[in-house]
């Protein structure tokens, strides 16, 4: 993650807010059904089928929620999942490797990509109505309100699921490693933010002072 702020061996930006992607699942529901945390795509699909339209859980609108809105929301899902599907989006290796982005010929028609898209198409049947409009906020909101049994989400959202003022699932969920396809390994996405000072700004020192303050341990922990 920190390496993304370096160009030509020079640190160009200030990394902050490193996050990772995890499976969030309702431990109370899984325990009631005698299930363990899903590990594979097949596990996620089977659990989603079980919880969708299950009369024992009328509050659930779906077994799983995913970003499905057109554009960057659905697009990010592909990039988040394709490595754990045993594939990759382009010829170059994983971001952070020496040849990352060197060859961006798309691999969207690869066997792994096609299998993942077909899995997504099957999963839609077990998601809430209107999931085609879901992006990051809608996905998290569905889980926070207890409307789905599972989501994959960035760790920055996890504390909100335990906030009693907004969450109906406080103390009722767990996290697990990013699911993977059969025969593949889990490759959890890691992300975050980088902050820079534009060289054309009129207030470079003030901007730098702000970044140092914002990235300080006490402020960043609160943020």
Regions found by a protein language model. Give the residues of each.
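Hinge/lid segment of periplasmic solute-binding proteins
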Residues: 1-21, 45, 74-86, 170-177
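A local structural motif
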Residues: 10, 33-37, 121-135, 147, ...
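Short helix-initiation/N-cap motifs at beta->coil->alpha
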Residues: 41-46, 131-145
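Paired acidic/hydrophobic, glycine-rich loop segments that form the ligand-binding mouth/hinge
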Residues: 149-154
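Short helix-loop capping/hinge motifs at secondary-structure junctions, enriched
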Residues: 28-38, 88-90, 125-126, 200-207
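Glycine-centered hinge/linker elements that transmit conformational signals in sensory
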Residues: 48-50, 92-133, 178
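Short glycine- and hydrophobic/aromatic-rich loop-to-beta-strand nucleating segment
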Residues: 21-25, 82, 195-197
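C-terminal lobe and pocket-closing loops
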Residues: 156-170, 181-223
